[in-house]
């Protein structure tokens, strides 16, 4: 903060990140039956390589006065030898997976499993080229059971495990981050009225993750990535997709999430950057006759509840809820001329009214959300 005279200290940040990735996925599907049970079996092997170079230098930004600011002051870039982060990380991951979707009358059962092998090596250029190598493997399974009623209702119960290698490096070259592992139970119901283009769904879930990556900030602006012991998230998800009329389509969604750190220094606090509520609504109206045949417009809103950007859940780390609006226009060029069938153009705008809002705070700084963005695109389908 500024002192009584209005003088304020500043810091400088220089971040340079380069990521390259190669990924390939091969799978084989077989459909067959064993007695009255039909099977769809998927067997696959995937492989990916990721190469990440990350440099972060934090330094002094000089001082200025908020009542009489001087712009254009030169800022000396700190030497690379003083970098807070300066590393190269290579990750190689191979996964073998299998899944069987079974059907017997109105019953549906899915069973699956995946084995992952990961090798990760990190070289710290700011720590005398110290290296850290980690190898890990993990099995994760999934299962789901549902019943398809003739009336359109489909209740289901599912269980899934997850495994994700760490994507950042620790400040300490002697400490490597562990992969993030998770387990989730979900109980829900879906409903599609027979003969309609409407789908309604509701679900409650219980997710537990360990070794979740979090970020904290030090004086001078340096951000430090760490891992928290265990996190639990319980929530409710509602979604509705409906072709209300031949012209009007509506998509609505709502999520309620209660997160809590289960282990570690900040036990009992909310998970960093996890909104307690989220909601969205999108409406699209397309003309199919008349002078506007093929032309459509869309309009919607997105609501994001409050978040804490720091692990301690302090007042300074809290960002309030916000709502932004989006819009779109699109046109089917095939309605203009039959030779253009399959071609269309579209313009999307996010944060349509260019609202200024705070998206996150980390206890030291707050950050504005994205300004209005307008993207035009052309597509062709055949």
Feature locations, PLM:
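Surface-exposed loop/turn segments flanking beta-strands in extracellular/periplasmic regions
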Residues: 2-8, 54-85, 131-132, 183, ...
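Residues that define the transmembrane beta-barrel architecture of outer-membrane proteins
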Residues: 18-22, 90-94, 135-139, 181-185, ...
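Short loop/turn motifs that connect adjacent beta-strands in outer-membrane beta-barrel proteins
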Residues: 32-41, 106, 150-152, 194-197, ...
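Residues on the lipid-exposed face of transmembrane beta-strands in outer-membrane beta-barrel proteins
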Residues: 24-30, 96-102, 143-147, 187-191, ...
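Membrane-embedded beta-barrel scaffold of Gram-negative outer-membrane proteins
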Residues: 155, 179-243, 250-255, 259-262
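Structural signature of Gram-negative outer-membrane beta-barrels, strongest in the C-terminal barrel
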Residues: 19, 35-42, 46-48, 87-209, ...
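Gram-negative outer-membrane beta-barrel transporters
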Residues: 106, 206, 226-311, 356, ...
């Amino acid at each position: 903060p500024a002192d009584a005279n209005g003088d304020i200290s500043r810091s400088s940040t220089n971040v340079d990140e380069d990521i390259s990735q190669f990924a390939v996925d091969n799978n084989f599907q077989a459909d067959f039956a064993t007695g009255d049970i039909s099977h769809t079996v998927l067997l696959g092997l995937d492989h990916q390589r990721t190469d990440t170079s990350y440099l972060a230098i934090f330094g002094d930004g000089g001082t200025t006065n908020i009542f009489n600011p001087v712009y254009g002051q030169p800022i000396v870039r700190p030497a690379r030898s003083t970098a807070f982060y300066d590393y190269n990380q290579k990750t190689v991951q191979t996964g073998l997976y299998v899944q069987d979707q079974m059907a017997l009358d109105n019953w549906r059962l899915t069973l699956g499993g995946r084995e992952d092998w990961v090798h990760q090596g990190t070289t710290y250029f700011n720590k005398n080229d110290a290296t850290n190598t980690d190898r890990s493997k993990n099995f994760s399974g999934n299962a789901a059971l549902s019943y398809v009623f003739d009336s359109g209702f489909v209740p289901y119960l599912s269980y899934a495990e997850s495994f994700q290698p760490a994507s950042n490096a620790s400040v300490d070259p002697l400490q490597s981050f562990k992969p993030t592992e998770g387990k989730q139970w979900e109980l829900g119901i879906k409903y599609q009225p027979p003969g309609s283009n409407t789908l309604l769904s509701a679900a409650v879930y219980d997710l537990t993750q360990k070794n979740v990556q979090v970020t904290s900030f030090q004086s001078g602006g340096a951000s430090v990535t760490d891992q928290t012991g265990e996190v639990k998230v319980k929530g409710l998800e509602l979604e509705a997709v409906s072709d209300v009329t031949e012209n009007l389509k509506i998509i609505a969604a709502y999520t309620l999430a209660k997160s809590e750190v289960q282990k570690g220094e900040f036990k009992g606090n909310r998970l960093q950057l996890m909104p307690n509520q989220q909601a969205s609504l999108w409406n699209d109206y397309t003309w199919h006759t008349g002078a506007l045949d093929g032309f459509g417009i869309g309009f919607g809103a997105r609501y994001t509840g409050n978040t804490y950007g720091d692990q301690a859940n302090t007042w300074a780390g809290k960002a309030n809820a916000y709502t932004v609006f989006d819009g779109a226009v699109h046109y089917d060029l095939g309605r203009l001329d039959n030779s253009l069938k399959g071609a269309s153009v579209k313009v999307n705008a996010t944060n349509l009214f260019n609202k200024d809002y705070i998206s996150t705070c980390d206890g030291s700084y707050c950050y504005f959300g994205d300004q209005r963005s307008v993207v035009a695109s052309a597509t062709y389908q055949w």
